[in-house]
A protein has these predicted regions:
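Signature of N-terminal electron-transfer/Fe-S-associated modules in redox systems
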Residues: 1-156, 174
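Flexible, low-hydrophobicity surface segments
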Residues: 145-310, 330, 414
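Glycine-rich loop/linker segments at domain edges
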Residues: 90, 165, 171-177, 238, ...
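Alpha-helical support elements that line or immediately flank enzyme active sites
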Residues: 101, 110, 196-226, 260-280, ...
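Acidic, glycine-rich active-site loops and adjacent beta-strand->loop/helix elements
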Residues: 62, 74, 229, 366-369, ...
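Beta-strand segments within the central parallel beta-sheet cores of soluble alpha/beta enzyme folds
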Residues: 35-38, 118-125, 226, 384-391, ...
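Short acidic, glycine/serine/threonine-rich loops at helix termini
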Residues: 83, 105-109, 142-143, 233-238, ...
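Glycine-rich and small/hydrophobic secondary-structure elements
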Residues: 141, 240-270, 398-445, 504-515
Length: 515
């Protein structure tokens, strides 16, 4: 047990727990964001006796007599100051990191109203921002310092909103002060918690699923398998090849494949129940990269597909072979690019419930809410579904595909319960699509002056365990492979291959950055 102060109010905490969980789950101080739960990202930063501390690291028993401040506990003047400074500087984008940045700013300025750039950087060193590149955030800190030195906080007036003027984002205040809602910020009555039991192998046959021990655990609401799905099992952004749940007898496609869904009354019971679901597998050889995917007699990632080819593109103009043959100089080179993680700060989360009209309402962090709606309808076999997008804590293409929304909708549809389904950071890294890795062979010919005469290229992408946007990404990659130069002879062939890797899909640049 510990007695300490939160925003000036004395609290008594009986159960020793991470401060982050107490602030969010008990006090519902949702400005304290959960980005990683492992002390890495800084989104959960609070002030403890004036020092910025990541709330996911200390336990409550260590806080006896100490004073914790969250953004909700700032004075009204401080709230106006930081809302103005961050809004005026254009420092707010997705907003997920901003409350933590604000408290680091306050801690710095409480000690030093004339910070140098190096001091500002040091003050923000433990806080990640994926959106801004920090330049605007540093501008906001400088502006806040100036306002405090001069004792003046200008008012941002809607009367100044006119063509050619710089205006604040309309969502600045709710993001700076942390009261804007991301899905994980919803705490609804009678809410249970859901999560998926995922494959232990990238490619294996599921022989049996034993849910009996999990179902017998007190506090478990329901365990769901593919046999319980009322509609279509497969979803997908453009092609329906992503299994919502792998059925008995089915093939897993990567480590992120969901085998069963568990819903429980608390997150603690949920984790215990997931470990009690026993899945029997027949492990099979996996496909790790395009060269393995195109090899003769390669294992097929999908039983139902004739090959591992997901998409093929061919773009040509002029006569590249002749142009290269007649060139003074010819060079051939092989290139490879790796997969790249989007690294948005907000892990995927969805909250689902039955709304007053009897519809399944899904509160989603989503870059493709209309597609999510369509896919949830197919999964449930019902048109009585609604999707309401909440604030999105970064996406960059990585939240265009289905992640947890359909699982939340399915649990609510089958149980009638309100449910929150949220990925841990490791799950998020495993499951959502990445930037496509590419294997590329280019041949270029030029004349004696170095003027390009022709280009030929064969490019191969790893689209992973399902199509996502593999086709459009490949098309863009092939279209831009010839570069921005003015020449009339090129031929580009591109092939996207299924593998047993995490999926690849939309990412800023969309194929252009690879070729």
């Amino acid at each position: 047990m510990a007695v300490f102060f939160v925003n000036g109010t004395e609290v008594t905490v009986e159960k020793n727990q991470r401060l982050l969980r107490y602030l969010r789950d008990t006090l519902h101080l949702t400005s304290v964001k959960d980005g990683c739960s492992e002390g890495a990202c800084g989104a959960c930063t609070v002030l403890i006796d004036g020092e910025p501390i990541r709330a996911c690291t200390p336990f409550t028993d260590s806080l006896a007599g100490r004073h914790v401040i969250t953004v909700e506990g700032l004075t009204d003047e401080e709230k106006r100051l930081y809302t103005y400074a961050y809004g005026e500087a254009g420092a707010v984008q997705c907003g997920f990191c901003i409350p933590g940045m604000v408290l680091c700013t306050k801690a710095l300025l409480d000690r030093n109203l004339n910070p140098t750039d190096d001091q500002i950087r040091y003050a923000l060193r433990n806080n990640y921002c994926r959106c801004t590149g920090y330049v605007k955030i540093m501008d906001a800190v400088r502006l806040a310092a100036k306002c405090r030195r001069e004792g003046v906080i200008p008012e941002a007036s809607e009367n100044d909103w006119k063509l050619g003027s710089s205006v604040h984002r309309i969502d600045v205040e709710e993001k700076v002060l942390g009261y804007g809602k991301y899905p994980d910020d919803w705490y609804l009555p009678d809410m249970c918690y859901g999560s998926a039991v995922r494959s232990q192998y990238p490619r294996a046959r599921v022989l049996a699923i034993d849910t009996s021990k999990a179902e017998a655990l007190p506090g478990v609401v329901r365990v769901i398998t593919a046999a319980d799905i009322p509609g279509e099992n497969k979803v997908g952004h453009l092609k329906h090849d992503q299994y919502s749940l792998i059925p008995i007898g089915g093939l897993t496609h990567y480590l992120g494949d969901a085998i069963a869904l568990v819903a429980a009354e608390t997150p603690e019971i949920l984790e215990k129940a997931k470990k009690l679901v026993k899945v029997t597998y027949e492990p099979l050889p996996a496909v790790h990269n395009p060269p393995e995917a195109w090899a003769e007699n390669a294992p097929r990632v999908f039983d139902e597909e004739e090959s591992n080819v997901q998409a093929y593109k061919h773009i040509a103009r002029g006569d590249a072979d002749t142009a290269i043959k007649n060139s003074k100089y010819v060079i051939s080179q092989h290139f490879e690019t790796p997969w790249t993680e989007h690294a948005f700060l907000e892990p995927e989360c969805a909250v689902s419930y039955i709304d007053p009209d009897g519809y399944v309402m899904v509160l989603s962090t989503d870059q493709s809410s209309h597609t999510t709606l369509h896919e949830c309808k197919l999964l449930l076999g019902s048109d009585k579904v609604r999707v309401q997008n909440q604030l999105v804590g970064g996406g960059f293409g990585g939240k265009e595909d289905m992640s947890v929304q359909h699982h939340a909708a399915l649990i609510t549809y089958l149980t009638g319960r309100t449910v929150k389904v949220k990925l841990t950071r490791p799950e998020s890294l495993l499951i959502h699509p990445k930037r496509h890795p590419f294997w590329m062979d280019f041949t270029m010919g030029c004349d004696e002056n170095g003027i390009i005469q022709g280009v030929k290229a064969k490019v191969y992408s790893d689209t992973g365990a399902f199509a996502s946007l593999g086709g459009p990404v490949l098309e863009r990659a092939c279209t831009h492979a010839a570069g921005p130069y003015n020449y009339q002879n090129f031929e580009i062939e591109g092939t996207a291959y299924y593998t047993n890797n995490p999926p690849a899909g939309a990412f800023r640049g969309f194929g252009v950055t690879q070729t």
